[in-house]
């Protein structure tokens, strides 16, 4: 298959998937999730391959969804990352949460092909892995970062929820909350200290370290790798990973269509996505004046 958003190559027992939209910092478009899943399937069906390395072309690993295209454009289902047609006679301003869920859950499961792959997956994170890009990286079995690279989910501040929900399963409740209640980015050193990623090394040593671990894994028989991975993943399945992802995907759609989400969408249309992001992440109150009371009714008996 000819891929438009990534490159796929095999060298000995190692398959490499390279996200290949460097001019957009490998931002996710509508094609990329399915192409990731297709490349993972190619590797799983290739008897020569024992391990898969995922990386990005250019300066970034993945900057998340290509929201400049979606956030700055006015149109149907405002705020939706998916857009989509509107039936004749329907209100074009209406948001269909189940249509949104259908598309975003499909993307999430395509990212999760990295987690469910029968062959181990290693994310080589040399540059920013943010928003949806962090979702992709954290779906891999192992994540090795450059110390200088950053990872995080800034849309947790407004307009998003991490649909793969891997933060809590990697960090535990308190550290996951610390990251998602702030939307902060952390560098590779801090990510490794927190236990979010396996390790961080200087950028100049990243290729050698990834190759070292990949080659060590690749020496193991494929059936042994498959058994160990299925056993570990089963523990996470038993903890409710799939249900948490469904919940997170629903919340992601809601976040994009909340009063604050619509504020962000309007700001992106007015001043451009980059400026809207600067306002979101600048440290001041987010979406001033947009929020509604969380408790709109008085207390009983009050």
Explain the meaning of each model-derived region.
Residues 17, 21, 35-36, 54, ...:
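Terminal peptide-recognition signature
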Residues 22-25, 59, 148-150, 185:
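A short, glycine- and basic residue-enriched loop/turn
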Residues 1-57, 71:
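Conserved CoA-thioester-binding segment of acyl-CoA-metabolizing enzymes
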Residues 112-225:
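Crotonase-fold acyl-CoA enzyme core
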Residues 59-63, 130, 232-235:
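Short, active-site-adjacent cap segments at secondary-structure transitions
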Residues 31-35, 106, 113, 209, ...:
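Charged catalytic carboxylate motif
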Residues 1-12, 79, 187-188, 208, ...:
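C-terminal alpha-helix plus adjacent terminal tail
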Residues 56-113, 275:
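Glycine- (often His-adjacent) and acidic-residue-rich active-site loop
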């Amino acid at each position: 298959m000819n891929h438009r958003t990534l490159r796929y190559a095999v060298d000995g027992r190692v398959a490499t998937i390279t996200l290949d939209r460097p001019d957009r910092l490998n931002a996710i478009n509508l094609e990329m999730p399915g192409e990731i899943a297709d490349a993972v399937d190619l590797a799983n069906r290739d008897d020569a391959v024992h391990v898969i390395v995922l990386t990005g072309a250019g300066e970034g690993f993945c900057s998340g969804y290509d929201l400049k295209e979606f956030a700055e454009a006015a149109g149907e289902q405002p705020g939706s990352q998916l857009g989509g047609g509107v039936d004749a006679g329907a209100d074009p301003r209406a948001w269909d949460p189940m249509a949104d869920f259908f598309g975003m859950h499909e993307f999430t499961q395509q990212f999760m092909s990295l987690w469910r792959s029968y062959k181990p997956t290693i994310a080589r994170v040399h540059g920013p892995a943010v928003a949806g890009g962090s979702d992709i990286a954290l779906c891999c079995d192992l994540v090795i970062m450059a110390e200088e690279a950053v990872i995080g989910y800034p849309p947790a501040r407004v307009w998003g929820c991490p649909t793969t929900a891997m933060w809590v399963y990697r960090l535990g409740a308190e550290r996951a909350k610390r990251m998602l209640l702030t939307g902060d980015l952390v560098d590779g050193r801090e990510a490794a200290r927190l236990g979010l990623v396996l390790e961080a090394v200087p950028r100049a040593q990243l290729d050698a370290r990834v190759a070292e671990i990949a080659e060590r894994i690749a020496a193991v028989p494929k059936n042994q790798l498959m058994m160990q991975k299925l056993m570990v993943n089963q523990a996470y399945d038993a903890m409710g990973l799939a249900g948490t992802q469904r919940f997170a995907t629903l919340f992601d759609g809601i976040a994009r269509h909340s009063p604050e989400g619509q504020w962000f969408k309007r700001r992106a249309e007015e001043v451009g996505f980059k400026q809207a992001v600067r306002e979101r992440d600048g440290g001041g109150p987010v979406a001033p004046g947009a929020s509604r009371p969380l408790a709109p009714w008085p207390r009983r008996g009050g």
